[in-house]
């Protein structure tokens, strides 16, 4: 009897593991059954997703264009560039140190700024709360993120949930019953599939990434107005490639630095490092508070001077 019981337990364990694998909803499934080979997608020069940063971020993450380790800092970096472009924040250089002078930067925030999107409003409010009378120092935001890591984590979860709900409401995704083979049975299983509308946007996201990352299309890039590049670079930051794109622009458009909104200091390096260190501070605090496990990305590195919507 004991032997039969052991065999039964082993069979049940195997069955449960097999079921978990079969019914796992990881990865993107398109309703049309097609897949996307990202690097083979034709470059696309228009900003996808109706310029909705949150949808663009969500699709890029789900398509593994950006990994979980850097996706959060990329999104924050993208919004900082957006706010700089829109004149909502100003970043100013300052020197510190009595003997050895070191460059640092403070962020001056418009405390009365308003946004249509609730998630963008919530993110900006965190910056305001971490500031002192509208002036935000880099280390001050790191300390705030470390202390309020749960709010940071909740915000990113909310971003994903709101985007998923919006995709369902606007025809990008739907629930579909599919049948999967498990041992001798075809078992029905409800899961989210992405429609042709989402498939097209995913092609555009991949194509836009390929367009930005391509170093052999300098003539095409040179034909685009600088003010449009200021917007393109917001989305390049979300993809984590703003610094590489900027280097290309300096070659393609010799006077780019003189005419861009982002011309006063190494902005891409600053924004990325600012976001990276802040998210890392939240990650470390979350790991300490949860016994070493966290959904945040890790990493380190300091910064001090030197060179360089809604779904519709």
Report residues per predicted region:
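Acidic, Ser/Thr/Pro-rich intrinsically disordered cytosolic tails and loops
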Residues: 1-312
């Amino acid at each position: 009897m004991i032997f039969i019981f052991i065999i039964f337990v082993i069979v049940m364990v195997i069955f449960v593991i097999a079921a978990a694998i079969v019914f796992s909803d990881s990865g993107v499934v398109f309703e049309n059954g097609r897949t996307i080979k990202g690097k083979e997608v034709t470059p696309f020069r228009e900003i996808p997703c109706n310029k909705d940063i949150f949808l663009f971020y969500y699709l890029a993450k789900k398509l593994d264009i950006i990994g979980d380790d850097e996706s959060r800092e990329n999104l924050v970096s993208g919004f900082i560039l957006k706010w700089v472009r829109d004149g909502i924040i100003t970043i100013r250089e300052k020197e510190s140190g009595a003997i050895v002078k070191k460059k640092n930067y403070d962020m001056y925030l418009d405390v009365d700024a308003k946004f249509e999107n609730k998630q963008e409003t919530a993110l900006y409010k965190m910056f305001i709360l971490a500031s002192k009378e509208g002036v935000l120092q880099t280390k001050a935001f790191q300390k705030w993120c470390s202390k309020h890591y749960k709010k940071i984590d909740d915000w990113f979860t909310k971003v994903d949930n709101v985007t998923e709900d919006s995709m369902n409401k606007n025809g990008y995704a739907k629930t579909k019953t599919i049948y999967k083979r498990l041992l001798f049975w075809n078992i029905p299983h409800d899961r989210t599939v992405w429609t042709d509308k989402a498939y097209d946007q995913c092609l555009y996201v991949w194509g836009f990434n390929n367009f930005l990352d391509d170093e052999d299309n300098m003539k095409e890039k040179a034909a685009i107005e600088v003010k449009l590049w200021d917007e393109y670079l917001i989305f390049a930051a979300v993809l984590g490639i703003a610094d590489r794109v900027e280097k290309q622009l300096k070659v393609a458009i010799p006077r780019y630095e003189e005419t861009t909104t982002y011309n006063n200091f190494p902005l891409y390096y600053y924004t990325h490092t600012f976001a990276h260190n802040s998210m890392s501070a939240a990650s470390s605090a979350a790991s300490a508070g949860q016994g070493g496990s966290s959904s945040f990305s890790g990493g380190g590195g300091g910064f001090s001077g030197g060179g360089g919507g809604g779904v519709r």
